[in-house]
Amino acid sequence: MDVPGPVSRRAAAAAATVLLRTARVRRECWFLPTALLCAYGFFASLRPSEPFLTPYLLGPDKNLTEREVFNEIYPVWTYSYLVLLFPVFLATDYLRYKPVVLLQGLSLIVTWFMLLYAQGLLAIQFLEFFYGIATATEIAYYSYIYSVVDLGMYQKVTSYCRSATLVGFTVGSVLGQILVSVAGWSLFSLNVISLTCVSVAFAVAWFLPMPQKSLFFHHIPSTCQRVNGIKVQNGGIVTDTPASNHLPGWEDIESKIPLNMEEPPVEEPEPKPDRLLVLKVLWNDFLMCYSSRPLLCWSVWWALSTCGYFQVVNYTQGLWEKVMPSRYAAIYNGGVEAVSTLLGAVAVFAVGYIKISWSTWGEMTLSLFSLLIAAAVYIMDTVGNIWVCYASYVVFRIIYMLLITIATFQIAANLSMERYALVFGVNTFIALALQTLLTLIVVDASGLGLEITTQFLIYASYFALIAVVFLASGAVSVMKKCRKLEDPQSSSQVTTS
């Protein structure tokens, strides 16, 4: 029964005050989990030995041959990553993130412990399998934070968490280069530092708060309460007028509710997640998302280019070792990785200031820059100068980081967080499937088992093919746009006459 008059207004005001205080408290609670997750990401990425992995495996510590490293060991990471990605994607959501973050930390510890003490081909292959687990579980790191902060904080906490890993990787690369070139430390010592850092990350992960919600399996529908004419929605107060229901973004807010939303005053036991229903919803969302041509276009480029990017990054140390063997000269792998990461970060920052009609020129832009990537990989492969190789690699990484950021923005622009996670997972899975096929044919000893220089020639041709495909698709799109612009003009002229 409604309470009339001033009492009703006082009750509404009191309810509004309580809700605003609750929202303020929730906003303040974002700092601790974000700080802990950033600390975890920083230490997990602080691995000074990583840019020197290939010289370490080929050196006296492991004494492996080039064929064993490139054709029998490195492919194991690709295969394990592919096999684990989809189960980990579902398990991450079902287990509510934190257990999978802990699994990643534990996998990194096992990886670097084995890198220090394991010997022989089979042992190093097992090491690559554990590194595949660590890579596949990385999705938990990037999605955990969305379950413990409000929707309005998503952009800020995303930038913090990604910056933490970026800074960690850069600091690790610079530290490794300084210790090798200036202090004369051994590569074994760098791996000891890496093991220490990932152990610290694992310890930090235990202090992360356990999320109560997740995107799919533990998702709560939108909560809506009314207090005498005031509509309380997702921790905010909205006037119940026709105009407010048609404000820009109203539907978007309804579909993108925060995951850590407060429970209603009357607590009810959370229903057990219907796994089959979740999978059915995922399938319907998949069909709906990829029926959009712009999203399909950007997703195709994402999958194709990420496949090539993984191959180049995974085997570029082998190419450098071929051009300039580390046992005969000083190497600067760590410095190159640090420079390419920093310049890539600058390029990513500049994306926000690029003004272009991506719906018209997006495919042509992808074609042009894919051609530049192909040229960089080709120069890296054919010019037998280590400094040219380093410079080409820096250009390659800058262009890829620039384009993948644009692709991410274009895909995420009109998707809810749930659908963005789905599209990200599907695109990554397709990229890994393509990479597995490419690895099996080109790299694996059971396939062609080609030399590293021949492999990079194929990778350059691969990116050139991507450029041709998007050039043709972009030309068709531009012509269609021009025809649409001409048709209204011609029809208006006919009407005038």
From Swiss-Prot:
Optimum pH is 8-8.5. Residues 1-28, 92-99, 150-165, 209-285, 355-363, 410-419, 480-497 are cytoplasmic. SUPFAM superfamilies: MFS general substrate transporter. The record marks 104-105, 109, 111-112, 186, 191 as: Essential for pyridoxine transport. It comes from the Eukaryota. The modification Phosphoserine is found at residue 222. Interacts with TSPAN1; this interaction increases the stability of SLC19A2. Interacts with TMEM63B. This is Thiamine transporter 1. It comes from Homo sapiens (Human).
